A protein has these predicted regions:
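Active-site-proximal beta-strand elements of phosphoester/diester hydrolases
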Residues: 208-212, 324-325, 364-368
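Short solvent-exposed loop/turn micro-motifs enriched in small/polar/acidic residues
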Residues: 10-13, 306, 338-339, 348-349
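Proline-centered loop/turn at the N-terminus of a beta-strand
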Residues: 124, 208, 280-282, 298, ...
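RNA-binding accessory domains that recognize and position tRNA/RNA substrates
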Residues: 2-246, 258, 373-378, 385-396
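Catalytic beta-strand/loop cores that center a nucleophilic Ser/Cys/Thr
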Residues: 319-361, 396
Length: 396
């Protein structure tokens, strides 16, 4: 598909897409991707690369992503950069907002134009609006609820869209994990991509790990396999008894979307039993938040969230700073961390909690995404830390 064949090229006719905010504000632009409309929470992501990984991250369920970097789509799409494990699930992101038109892809790995890929995935897109102004609005007023709509005719039921945006309850109180979790148990042995070789296979695993899928990303599974794990991925509603019956050397609590307090209604009792069993446990993102809930802390909704691949985090135990990839709109309230739980990492942007460890137990978690994809690799060591804990437990 050439640029001139899609609405994203900003044709010389009336706008074909709208972003309707809950306060009644209407932003006009040009449509791309699927036609139709979707409601969600508008956030902004500051990453300059990795748009396909971001758009396929299940943690974005219920959200409309605004990219602050203006040139999105210029390297096309491919099959290797998809992060969703459950391809049958509803796409995570409800919509995407871009500043400029999508150019023809120019990359040796590209197999498809981003516009065609969005259509195939059922994701609605909008280009041609002032994304800097929208980002400034989010920074000052918080993440708004909104409807994104695309119609090639340029005709919209504006009253109905405004009403839908206004009445949508927002992400607080929503359990979105059922939309993205795997329906059945499966095993994973694919290891990280290597230049000129592609993805590898773990054919001599040292550890048996059960990964609870709240919306897990492929690169997390690859890095687990890369440190010697045979990974069994289980649905989010799997009981502690079923997990422990698999005799895991470790349990991984994955990333995912929605309000952790709502998902925690069924997940927290499971996590508490896993902690009591003494099994080494590692959590990321939503898994981190629910681990916090499991030890008695509380979570809270953030004003604008953290979404990007350049977030500095300080390791409070070493004083070192890591540049990390983040994607979350909720956080563990550090003021509620109980005795016996150590805060290990904090954000250097706002001081919010980014990591915890349980004293005297092989249990830890981080709020950010050490697997990156996209993002820096500063935090890959955490997967090795998990492997070391399992090795120590096995040799005890």
């Amino acid at each position: 598909m050439t640029t001139s064949e899609n609405d994203a090229a900003w044709p010389d006719h009336k706008p074909t897409a709208l972003l309707v905010l809950a306060d009644g504000t209407v932003l006009e632009g040009f449509g791309l991707g699927a036609e139709g409309h979707a409601v969600g929470e508008v956030c902004f992501n500051t990453a300059m690369t990795g748009y396909q990984e971001i758009l396929t991250d299940p943690s974005y369920a219920g959200q409309i992503i605004t990219f602050t970097f203006p040139h999105i789509g210029n390297v096309g799409t491919n099959e290797d950069d998809i992060e969703t494990v459950n391809m049958a699930a509803t796409p995570g992101a409800r919509g995407v907002i871009l500043r400029t038109a999508i150019s023809d892809p120019s990359n040796y790995r590209a197999t498809r134009h981003l516009d065609a890929w969005l259509k195939a995935r059922g994701i609605i897109g909008l280009s041609g609006i002032d994304t800097r102004a929208l980002t400034a609005l989010i920074r000052s007023k918080g993440m708004p609820n909104a409807v994104i709509a695309h119609a090639k005719s340029g005709e919209f039921d504006l009253h109905g869209l405004k009403e839908e945006a206004r009445e949508w309850p927002g992400l607080e109180g929503m359990d979105l994990v059922p939309m993205v979790t795997s329906a059945q148990r499966f095993t994973w042995d694919e290891t990280p991509w290597i230049w000129d070789k592609g993805f590898g296979r773990q054919d001599a695993p040292e550890f048996n790990v059960v990964a609870v899928d709240y919306g897990i990303k492929r690169n997390i599974l690859r890095l687990l396999a890369g440190v010697g794990c045979k990974v069994t991925v289980v649905p989010a509603t799997t009981s502690a008894e079923d997990i422990l019956a698999m005799k895991p050397d470790g349990v991984f609590l994955s990333n995912g979307p929605g309000d952790p307090a709502e998902t925690g209604k069924y997940a927290v009792p499971v996590i508490q039993k896993i902690i009591e069993s003494g099994t080494p446990t590692f959590g990321i993102c939503l898994g981190h938040q629910m681990l916090g809930l499991a030890v008695g802390a509380k979570t809270k909704k953030m004003h604008q969230g953290h979404h990007g691949a350049n977030h500095p985090v300080k390791d409070e135990t070493t004083g070192k700073v890591e540049i990390t990839s983040m994607n979350h709109g909720f956080a563990v309230d550090q003021a509620t961390l109980p005795k016996g739980t150590t805060q290990t990492h904090i954000s250097l942007f706002d001081g919010s909690n980014c990591g915890i460890a349980l004293e005297g137990k092989p249990v830890f978690s981080v709020q950010y995404h050490p697997e990156a994809s996209p993002g820096p690799r500063d935090s890959h060591y955490l997967f090795q830390r998990f492997a070391d804990l399992m090795r120590q437990k096995k040799s005890a």
